[in-house]
């Protein structure tokens, strides 16, 4: 016997969350819950505004169509919509035991630029000291000074930086000018510094600062090839599609000798715990980029271990079936 339910949810965000020049006041999404005999599986479908090509309404329509076919015994193909394909494939992988329970709950802490704050979070971090800094939101010179300060203050720190294509080549050079050349090899990578891949490649060549592809992975014509200066691929499953597609991208990165980083699209605690399991399974040597839960004001259905945010269970969700 098969059973299924789809739930709608909304979580208030912290006041300061801005994505692509728009303030994100709430995080809205869907859960799918599948049951077959004595097994069950959950998945999250939460397109990220400004980043996902699909709207939540489009994802919901695709999800409901799939669920209604599945629960009457059919084997429908996964929707083409990435967030729906990812969430459904996670629920199916829990249902059939494909998704291992073991999880990597280490998270590269998101740093606002305050070294004291970062010292504290890194002190509790076992092994490699890795943190992430968003750049491109303020002046490039300020970003360069902050990054330089952090690398100077914490000698065993490696930084992941994310510019979200915010910089012109000139701005990118202004940033690099303020980062001591002796520290640049401790920048693990800088995600997509410039609007075009060619400008980003030139930046890497000119500065010696390694770069990573993120948005590029989802563009038509992107090819998985080894390139000078490119050290990593940042894979956001909610924006990518099914678990199979995520596995293919990780395998392609590893085949080229690149680091593959499983990264958050600001999912709920349920989605983040699944991403932690996917990271432990597919990228066990790499700390995932999942430090986004504290941008939200509560956890849903599954807790992130050790996180003090309030927890809401299924009763807080809106069933759609």
From Swiss-Prot:
Pathway stated in the Swiss-Prot or TrEMBL entry: Quinol/quinone metabolism; 1,4-dihydroxy-2-naphthoate biosynthesis; 1,4-dihydroxy-2-naphthoate from chorismate: step 4/7; Quinol/quinone metabolism; menaquinone biosynthesis
GO annotation, biological process: menaquinone biosynthetic process
Pfam families (alphabetical): MenC_N, MR_MLE_C
GO molecular function terms listed in the Swiss-Prot or TrEMBL record: magnesium ion binding; O-succinylbenzoate synthase activity
Residues that hold Mg(2+) according to the record: 162, 191, 214
Active site positions: 134, 236
E.C. code: 4.2.1.113
Keywords, sorted A to Z: Lyase, Magnesium, Menaquinone biosynthesis, Metal-binding
CDD domains (alphabetical): OSBS
Gene3D superfamilies referenced in this protein's UniProt entry, alphabetically: Enolase-like C-terminal domain, Enolase-like, N-terminal domain
Cofactor(s) required, per the database record: a divalent metal cation
Annotated catalysed reactions: (1R,6R)-6-hydroxy-2-succinyl-cyclohexa-2,4-diene-1-carboxylate = 2-succinylbenzoate + H2O
Function description: Converts 2-succinyl-6-hydroxy-2,4-cyclohexadiene-1-carboxylate (SHCHC) to 2-succinylbenzoate (OSB).
HAMAP family, A to Z: MenC_1 (MF_00470)
Family classification: Belongs to the mandelate racemase/muconate lactonizing enzyme family. MenC type 1 subfamily.
Protein's name according to its UniProt entry: o-succinylbenzoate synthase
